[in-house]
């Protein structure tokens, strides 16, 4: 145990940068948050200004320490968690970006992805990187910058330009250009990293014409990478000692560090990750294979599945359908009826993600009869989030052969007790909701704290992890399967809607 009293987690997200100060009992002492500009140069293109990312993140660090009235010499370490896949390319000499950050949501590299498919790279990419060919991942974004900024590829070959995901960019700035690193979890989202050899993949670098000289060193998620003196009063150099991409940080924050443990984050969409231990499981059900953190930040593997519409479907009830005036009201109205009266809502507004991967599916409401009212539709919309989660979990169990015993949950929608109970009912599994909801920041703090001895081991952290509420299945297996079969029938009818229309 150190005499330093606090850990700071920097949580660099897609729309805001946050700093969270935690004490030795993993209690939150102070939080600072700043939003920054979203740049949309063309339809489907999304950018951030890397200097604004840096300015917003560094100012939240200073603010969070000032709010808590803490000197930098009281901080044991800083941990970083970040929006994944987003790309920055900058000059080694000046630290100046040569282009805006291209954000994970940006679709501009769709044609590069199509070319990779035409070149027969799809199967290799799945096996080597664990990913599917999609503009979502970093590699094609780096290629796009090198293709479109004059002279940049030659400069990169000469070692004048550097590439990094957001974690790498922040650490470069925090250490005044002394440290150029990333961690295994972020590297595994680039489509440039071989998740089996744990090294940058030469075949992928050649395919995208990306010089190796511009890539960061890849390190464990929990170790000291460098020191920073940013943070206001005290002037002491603070170790930067933890890095993980946001979903992997949440998995670690939920202490899902053993094979078969899983968490689901309920945000705009859902991200479910299951730790598969030391073996990388190749999915045959449309899931991603990715790197997660083991008990000491070492490499573990995970399966990841994404649901596109979770919280977004509740926003649709509020903003477009005007059935509720606040997202929190959905629980109240859903519990005014005893069931959905046979209604199923399939919220495939932008197609369906894992395990269907059908961009042509469209949203639909099935089972309407004269007795159906708005409460039934609200309830069915909430239930659709739980059904989609079961779809992903079934794919995970089929790929891994692991039976889930409990699902840990986080994100905005977990405050909805009706949804959490129905989730448990439809999975036939315990659902555990933690007391501390800031699990992404918690994961980054844990990784940093373990690296510097602020916490000794995971047993110490387990003692601090309080499950605020546990939901247990309250329906019989026959009822569960009957309801789920109705969902599957509804999804089947919503698939390929657009294609059917065009035929």
UniProtKB/Swiss-Prot annotation:
<comment type="pathway">
    <text>Polyol metabolism; glycerol degradation via glycerol kinase pathway; sn-glycerol 3-phosphate from glycerol: step 1/1.</text>
</comment>
<feature type="binding site">
    <location>
        <position position="14"/>
    </location>
    <ligand>
        <name>sn-glycerol 3-phosphate</name>
    </ligand>
</feature>
<dbReference type="GO" id="GO:0005829">
    <property type="term" value="C:cytosol"/>
</dbReference>
<feature type="binding site">
    <location>
        <position position="18"/>
    </location>
    <ligand>
        <name>ADP</name>
    </ligand>
</feature>
<feature type="binding site">
    <location>
        <position position="412"/>
    </location>
    <ligand>
        <name>ADP</name>
    </ligand>
</feature>
<keyword id="KW-0319">Glycerol metabolism</keyword>
<feature type="binding site">
    <location>
        <position position="136"/>
    </location>
    <ligand>
        <name>sn-glycerol 3-phosphate</name>
    </ligand>
</feature>
<feature type="binding site">
    <location>
        <position position="246"/>
    </location>
    <ligand>
        <name>sn-glycerol 3-phosphate</name>
    </ligand>
</feature>
<feature type="binding site">
    <location>
        <position position="136"/>
    </location>
    <ligand>
        <name>glycerol</name>
    </ligand>
</feature>
<feature type="binding site">
    <location>
        <position position="14"/>
    </location>
    <ligand>
        <name>ATP</name>
    </ligand>
</feature>
<comment type="subunit">
    <text>Homotetramer and homodimer (in equilibrium). Heterodimer with EIIA-Glc. Binds 1 zinc ion per glycerol kinase EIIA-Glc dimer. The zinc ion is important for dimerization.</text>
</comment>
<keyword id="KW-0067">ATP-binding</keyword>
<feature type="binding site">
    <location>
        <position position="268"/>
    </location>
    <ligand>
        <name>ADP</name>
    </ligand>
</feature>
<dbReference type="InterPro" id="IPR005999">
    <property type="entry name" value="Glycerol_kin"/>
</dbReference>
<dbReference type="InterPro" id="IPR018485">
    <property type="entry name" value="FGGY_C"/>
</dbReference>
<dbReference type="GO" id="GO:0004370">
    <property type="term" value="F:glycerol kinase activity"/>
</dbReference>
<dbReference type="GO" id="GO:0005524">
    <property type="term" value="F:ATP binding"/>
</dbReference>
<feature type="binding site">
    <location>
        <position position="311"/>
    </location>
    <ligand>
        <name>ADP</name>
    </ligand>
</feature>
<keyword id="KW-0808">Transferase</keyword>
<feature type="binding site">
    <location>
        <position position="315"/>
    </location>
    <ligand>
        <name>ATP</name>
    </ligand>
</feature>
<feature type="binding site">
    <location>
        <position position="85"/>
    </location>
    <ligand>
        <name>sn-glycerol 3-phosphate</name>
    </ligand>
</feature>
<dbReference type="GO" id="GO:0006071">
    <property type="term" value="P:glycerol metabolic process"/>
</dbReference>
<feature type="binding site">
    <location>
        <position position="247"/>
    </location>
    <ligand>
        <name>glycerol</name>
    </ligand>
</feature>
<feature type="binding site">
    <location>
        <position position="16"/>
    </location>
    <ligand>
        <name>ATP</name>
    </ligand>
</feature>
<comment type="function">
    <text>Key enzyme in the regulation of glycerol uptake and metabolism. Catalyzes the phosphorylation of glycerol to yield sn-glycerol 3-phosphate.</text>
</comment>
<keyword id="KW-0479">Metal-binding</keyword>
<dbReference type="InterPro" id="IPR000577">
    <property type="entry name" value="Carb_kinase_FGGY"/>
</dbReference>
<protein>
    <recommendedName>
        <fullName>Glycerol kinase</fullName>
        <ecNumber>2.7.1.30</ecNumber>
    </recommendedName>
</protein>
<keyword id="KW-0021">Allosteric enzyme</keyword>
<feature type="binding site">
    <location>
        <position position="412"/>
    </location>
    <ligand>
        <name>ATP</name>
    </ligand>
</feature>
<keyword id="KW-0547">Nucleotide-binding</keyword>
<feature type="binding site">
    <location>
        <position position="416"/>
    </location>
    <ligand>
        <name>ADP</name>
    </ligand>
</feature>
<feature type="binding site">
    <location>
        <position position="14"/>
    </location>
    <ligand>
        <name>ADP</name>
    </ligand>
</feature>
<dbReference type="GO" id="GO:0019563">
    <property type="term" value="P:glycerol catabolic process"/>
</dbReference>
<dbReference type="Pfam" id="PF02782">
    <property type="entry name" value="FGGY_C"/>
</dbReference>
<comment type="similarity">
    <text>Belongs to the FGGY kinase family.</text>
</comment>
<feature type="binding site">
    <location>
        <position position="85"/>
    </location>
    <ligand>
        <name>glycerol</name>
    </ligand>
</feature>
<dbReference type="GO" id="GO:0046872">
    <property type="term" value="F:metal ion binding"/>
</dbReference>
<feature type="binding site">
    <location>
        <position position="84"/>
    </location>
    <ligand>
        <name>glycerol</name>
    </ligand>
</feature>
<feature type="binding site">
    <location>
        <position position="15"/>
    </location>
    <ligand>
        <name>ATP</name>
    </ligand>
</feature>
<feature type="binding site">
    <location>
        <position position="84"/>
    </location>
    <ligand>
        <name>sn-glycerol 3-phosphate</name>
    </ligand>
</feature>
<dbReference type="InterPro" id="IPR018483">
    <property type="entry name" value="Carb_kinase_FGGY_CS"/>
</dbReference>
């Amino acid at each position: 145990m150190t005499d330093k009293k606090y850990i700071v987690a920097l949580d660099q997200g897609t729309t805001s940068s946050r700093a969270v100060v935690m004490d030795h009992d993993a209690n939150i002492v102070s939080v600072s948050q700043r939003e920054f500009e979203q740049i949309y140069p063309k339809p489907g293109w999304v950018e951030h200004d890397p200097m604004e990312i840096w300015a917003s993140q560094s100012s939240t660090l200073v603010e969070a320490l000032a709010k808590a009235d803490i000197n930098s010499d009281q901080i044991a370490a800083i941990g970083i968690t970040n929006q994944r896949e987003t790309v920055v390319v900058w000059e080694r000499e000046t630290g100046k970006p040569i282009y805006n950050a291209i954000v994970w949501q940006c679709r501009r590299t769709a044609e590069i992805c199509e070319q990779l498919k035409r070149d027969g790279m799809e199967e290799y990419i799945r096996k080597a990187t664990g990913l599917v060919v999609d503009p979502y991942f970093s590699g094609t974004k780096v290629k796009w910058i090198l293709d479109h900024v004059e002279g940049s590829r030659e400069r990169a070959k000469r070692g004048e330009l550097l590439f990094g995901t957001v974690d790498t960019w922040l650490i470069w700035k925090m250490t005044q250009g002394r440290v150029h690193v990333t961690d295994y979890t972020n590297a595994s989202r680039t489509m440039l990293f071989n998740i089996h050899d744990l090294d940058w993949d030469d075949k992928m670098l050649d395919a995208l014409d990306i010089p190796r000289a511009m890539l960061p060193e890849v390190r464990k998620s929990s170790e000291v990478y460098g020191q920073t003196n940013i943070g206001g009063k005290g002037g002491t150099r603070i170790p930067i000692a933890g890095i993980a991409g946001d979903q992997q940080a949440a998995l670690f924050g939920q202490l899902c560090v053993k094979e078969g443990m899983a968490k689901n984050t309920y945000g705009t969409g859902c991200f479910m990750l299951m730790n598969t231990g030391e073996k990388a499981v190749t999915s045959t059900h449309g899931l991603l294979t990715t790197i997660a953190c083991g008990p000491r930040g070492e490499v573990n593997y995970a399966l990841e599945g994404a649901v596109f519409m979770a919280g977004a479907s509740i926003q649709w009830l509020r903003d477009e359908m005007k059935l509720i005036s606040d997202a929190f009201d959905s629980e109240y109205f859903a519990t005014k009826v005893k069931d959905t009266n046979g209604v199923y809502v399939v919220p495939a507004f932008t197609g369906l993600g894992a395990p269907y991967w059908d961009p042509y599916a469209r949203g639909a409401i099935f089972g309407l009869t004269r007795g159906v009212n708005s409460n039934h539709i609200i309830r069915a919309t909430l239930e659709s989030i739980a059904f989609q989660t079961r779809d992903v979990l079934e794919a995970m169990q089929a790929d891994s052969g692991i039976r889930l015993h409990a699902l840990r949950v986080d994100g905005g929608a977990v405050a909805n007790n009706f949804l959490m109970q129905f989730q448990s009912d439809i999975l036939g599994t315990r659902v555990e909701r933690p007391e501390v909801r800031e699990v992404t920041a918690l994961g980054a703090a844990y990784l940093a704290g373990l690296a510097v001895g602020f916490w000794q081991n995971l047993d110490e952290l387990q003692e601090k992890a309080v499950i605020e509420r546990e939901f247990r299945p309250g329906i019989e297996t026959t009822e569960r399967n009957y309801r789920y079969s109705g969902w599957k029938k509804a999804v089947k009818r919503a698939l390929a809607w657009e294609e059917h229309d065009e035929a």
